[in-house]
Amino acid sequence: HTAAEYFFGKRVPIGGAAGDQQAALFGQQCFERGSVKNTYGTGCFMLMNTGNKPHPSKHGLVTTIAWGYQGEITYALEGSVFVAGSAVQWLRDQLMFFKTAKESEKLALSAKEEHELIVVPAFVGLGAPYWDNDCKGAMFGITRGTSKEDMTKATLDSIAYQNRDILDAMKEDSSIAIQSLRVDGGASANDYLMQFQSDIMQCVIERPENVESTALGAAYLAGLAVGYWTNLEEIKKERNSHIFTPLMKVSDVNDLYERWQKAVSCARMFTKNEE
């Protein structure tokens, strides 16, 4: 229980405790093995429910505990993108392309180039699955005609590419076919980014009406503990989502992702022998 002096003289029962990303996984109702959520903040944090057995990663991910419920432990695979929304902040604050992050969507949609520019936003290195702290940011395909719209679009694209890297690693580690990705966090409000994420991953993106999944997950855990909800099926009834489905041809997706992988290799090679 909590200390009474902090809660209006009442001792409130503590019904659940969870790390922020595990709480978000629960809040996104990823109760089944193979279900995946991704939180889009300054960075991105993707977790996959791998069921009641841990899957030691061989592809640069972290094996972790998701939660314990009714005496059973659920495990997860986790991958982190270091730079996501913070790259949009860089466009806003350092390059002054726009005044609010929300405007980035409008700029991206007005870009003339069709994903020809590639940005590798390794401002603090690259996270999963590379774990390369020495890599520096880079931009490939720039010409005299490259505009702020093109750079904004490419920066948003880079967020989606990095998450594709992690999702592919999860598929390799778990041998689970992933049908959809549940998203939350501030940058998930960007429709351009979510549509391109669906395209580049070739999977359905589900964005719930309430994107504060971390707080929701904590509430679910506490509510289950005190009997506000009696089981997970009751919680599932509360889900309403906006759906994004892939629109891009698979051949085009493969070409774009191959260019991204080439750009990452070049960026990593540039700093490889600096010592």
How would you name each of these model-derived features?
Residues 12-16, 77-81, 93-97, 129, ...:
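Hydrophobic alpha-helical scaffolding
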Residues 80, 87, 225-275:
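Acidic, glycine/GT-rich loop-and beta-edge segments that sit at the periphery of enzyme/chaperone cores
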Residues 13, 24-27, 86-94, 103-106, ...:
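Alpha-helical scaffold segments in soluble metabolic enzymes
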Residues 113-210, 214-216:
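Activation-segment/catalytic-loop signature of the eukaryotic protein kinase fold
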Residues 36-39, 89-92, 96-105, 206, ...:
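Acidic/polar loop patches that form or flank catalytic/metal-binding clefts of enzymes
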Residues 10, 68-77, 140-141, 151, ...:
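Short beta-alpha connecting loops at secondary-structure transitions
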Residues 1-72, 82-86, 99-114, 188-192, ...:
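ATP-dependent carbohydrate kinase catalytic cores
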Residues 24-27, 77, 82, 157, ...:
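Glycine-rich phosphate-binding/hydrolytic loop that grips phosphoryl groups
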